[in-house]
Amino acid sequence: MAIHRYLQQQMVLRKLQLLVDVKTEAISTIDRLVQILKKYPSIIQNKNIKIVLSGNAPPDSTFKNYPDFIWFDGRLNKNYTTSELSKIALISEDYYKVIGYKFIWPLDSVSIDKAKQFIDKVHQLGKPVRLWASPDKPAAWEQFMQWGVDLINTDKINDLADFIIQRNDCEYFKPSNK
């Protein structure tokens, strides 16, 4: 029992962001997801859990119509109103769109500058950044950390976890204030 209480106490201090990739029609899918989530008040009322919808999205102007526990994945090339931006949890983009072309690692200085400019613009909006469809290997993860990418997209969760632990850089475990 003591271990269970300890783990509960530890989870209170941690944040979880659940990124849901909507692949079907946005409005009906999100409406159904909201109905299901409302059955779990311990999730939707927990300020340490953020549910972010990516992929297919409803019109930006309707973001305000969704409950406070629903957030959206934004794009830098959109001109959001202040209200719409307040429902954006992060800004994501296709890695190859950011650098301008598909290229073998490592990148040249022009591509690195494009990536850094993108990341800086997102951070100026006060939002975390995620690059999707990016190289999924330690050299890329290291570069993303150096650039200030906030969320590393990966299909290799265990490898990324091992990489971060071996890197012994605890700053990536600090809770975000964003």
Which residues are covered by each model-predicted region?
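Catalytic cores of phosphodiester-bond hydrolases, prominently lipid phosphodiesterases
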Residues: M1-K178
